[in-house]
Amino acid sequence: SEMCIRDSSDIGIKSDAKVTTLPHISGFVGSDIVAGVYASGLCKDDKNVLFIDIGTNGEMVLKFGDKLLATSCATGPALEGMNISCGMRAGEGAIDNFCIDENKLSYTTVGNKKAVGICGSGVLAMVRELLKNNIINGRGAIDIEKQKKAYDFIDFDKSGKPFIKILDDIYFTSKDIRQVQLAKGAILSGILALVSEAKIELKDISKVYIAGQFGKYISVDSFFCVGLLPIEFFDKVEYLGNTALTGAYMALLDKYAIEDMSLLSNKTEFFELSRLDNYDRIFAKALRFNGENI
């Protein structure tokens, strides 16, 4: 978990420079998280604080009392618009939000351009709207009998499976809903497991920091309606953006920063979710879409 210094020529940078890598916590929680936690000021807070970096992997660090506990979960690429039928990364023409009002489906796109796909914020917004309008149930299944007459955007493929038709060439399927459900289950189960391991309750956490580029584009409404975050965190969320980059700047500008980051990484205890005896039950519970959050 210690920092290391290497010749910059090893990684294609100016040959007479030295490159310092920041310390990490484990093979699953790297130096980007150490830098991010340091930049957030989490360790200076006298209350219980949760730091979450959301990407293809979800890394979390919980500060409770004078202890630090970390874990990592496999979120998957769905929240970044990948592994989705018509998904794409955020860019011009990406659908970034949906609304269902009076049984009609509307959307907005990045740059107000013609829709060409759905990015991560749009993927979450779609599931949020489907839940709000009871089009999908707690298991993520589209309620065919109840909805097929009420919404003209519900269509059926050749095998009779329902899907959401946005445009002729842009759609959202049950498999896409499942990908979001798996991502939601991973993040929420990680949070629940951390809290359980720390022997505190969700309500005992006073601040939740969301880091990473993805987090700042997602509305609070989407986070809580879909259930990525428990309702106990409502009004406690703060978006920090790219904390890894901020931490790297701090390491360059403050001669004590790297030493402090090393202390932080050594102090943080990492545990694997799969090693928890009851993790299967925690994950199964976290998979379900909960109507209480809507």
Model feature map: region roles:
Residues 36-37, 57-60, 69-70, 77-79, ...:
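Flexible loop/turn segments at secondary-structure boundaries
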